[in-house]
Amino acid sequence: MSVCVSPLVQATILMTEESLTCPQCPKSFSSTKLLQQHQQMFHTDKSVLLSLKSTDAPVGMDRAFICETCGKAFRFRSNLAEHRSVHTALKPYVCKFCGKSSRLKGNLTKHILKHHKKEQNEAIAKDDIIVKKAPKIVTKDNGPTTNGSTPTTSTATPSVITVSSALASSNGHNNNNNNHAVNNNLRTIKMELEDPDYNLIAKSAPTPVVSKIVATHTVTPRSRPTPKDIKEILETIAPSVGVSETPEEMCLLPKDASSESDRSVLISLGFDFGSTLSLNHQQLQQVVRELKGELSISPDTVQSDHSDDFEQDSPPPMAIANISTVGGEATLAAMIVAATNASGQRGDGTPDSTDTQKGCSPQRELSPESDPSTSSGDSCPSPPKMLHCKECGTLVRKSSHLPIHMTMSHGYPPPLVAAPVEEKPAPEQPVNASSLHNELRVISNAICELKAQQAATPRVEQALTYIDSRVGKLERSLETALNSIYTLVQLQTGMTSSVNRLREDSTKNFSDLKTRMEMSLSPIKPFQQRFSRERSSSSSVERSPSRERSRSPL
């Protein structure tokens, strides 16, 4: 033996040919494994394996684990545990794809790799996150520049992370929401660039108080074809970001009248509240009549609907008396007529006037609660009117929202609620005497029938009681008859069995009597037969000597 002294490995005893000889036979082996296999194959006696625990056993066999059933020795406890399944016929390793069971784990692994490799790869892909590393940065020299420096360009590909399907399914809802929000943002930016009127509606001042009271539905803007590549949208938006106008410049009604420019805009539109010129109720009615006439002439409007809307949208007379304008009723009428004509021309020429499900104007899409009664089947409806608050200039889509906004934001009294109209009962028709007499006669006949039925009720109950008692008597008599019939049947059965027994006994007695009589007469006949036999035999003996005598020569 020699000891390996290596600085990297623990000192171990090297096996030589002298120590690898079998203790039971003169064979020698080059390795411990071959010696163990030889002993398991040819020397499986338990006593021999136990002898290996002695001090003269070869190195590597001093800690052998022996099977209690067959006596085989193993170097490791795990090998012995696997071997014990041979004697118990247990197959604990079951294939999850086909249900085949195996005794060893290695056999199950081989089976899966051979028959279920595709399913195993799919199962592994569900739980793994595959991360592909980015390639190394490649630098390129473009030559020296005028400053003497050498510019370098680096190209690096970002790492790609492939999330497994299990994680994708768990986060699918959040990803869908995020993608939907991104698509909405991109669609909004594209519409702002292509449609300048979109900002007029989309960038209007919000009404937080009204939105808390009156529930409004948030509708997405016009659906446009979503581009396939986000990079194209970014390239389209990038050069136009610096040129786009601000929301304040796009809004025609300024929010704050503190500056001179904003005040001049309000004065030009007739919304300056500091002047002294006012309109009374008669002048306002005249302006309304003129507007009705011009609206009825325009081809894209409906006279009845717009007149009702205008009357509903107009503030009360006391509030109108406090409104002051610079241009008077002529300025106000001209402004409204110009707005109406512009909306009519836009409905004829622009593609936004087409009232389709996905291609209508932004104003109609942004106001889903607009009155559908103004739309007709033959002509395209005009866009809904945008009302404004006289105190803060806030745009309001519906006329019913304006009183609520004025009440909640500016302290105006709430609008009067119309009292419910009570419906008067219809006048009763005069009653005819003959019909009343007929009805009374029918009622009296019905009462007489009820009394007759009540009088006949006791008799019916008495008849039912009598019938019930008779039925009870019949049941008892029927039960008695059945019992008597059963008794007769039992008697007949007993008589039949007695007659049969008597017949059998008589037959047996007669046969016995006959045999006895025959036996009583039988002793005379045997004696006669014996006597006749003796006589026949004696006669035959006497005849034989006479024959011999006749045949003799003398």
Curated annotation (Swiss-Prot):
UniProt note: phenotype after gene disruption: RNAi-mediated knockdown, on an RNAi-sensitized rrf-3 genetic background, causes sluggish movement, abnormal morphology and low brood size, whereas when RNAi is targeted mainly at muscle, animals move normally and have healthy body morphology.
TM spans (from-to): none
Low complexity: bias regions: 142-158
Basic and acidic residues compositional bias, start-end: 544-554
Swiss-Prot/TrEMBL keywords: Metal-binding, Nucleus, Repeat, Zinc, Zinc-finger
Subcellular location: Nucleus; Nucleus speckle
UniProt keyword annotation of Transcription regulation present: no
Main localization of the protein described in the UniProt heading: nucleus
A single cellular component GO annotation: nuclear speck
GO annotation, biological process: regulation of transcription by RNA polymerase II
Listed name of the protein: Zinc finger protein syd-9
Taxonomic lineage of the native organism: Eukaryota, Metazoa, Ecdysozoa, Nematoda, Chromadorea
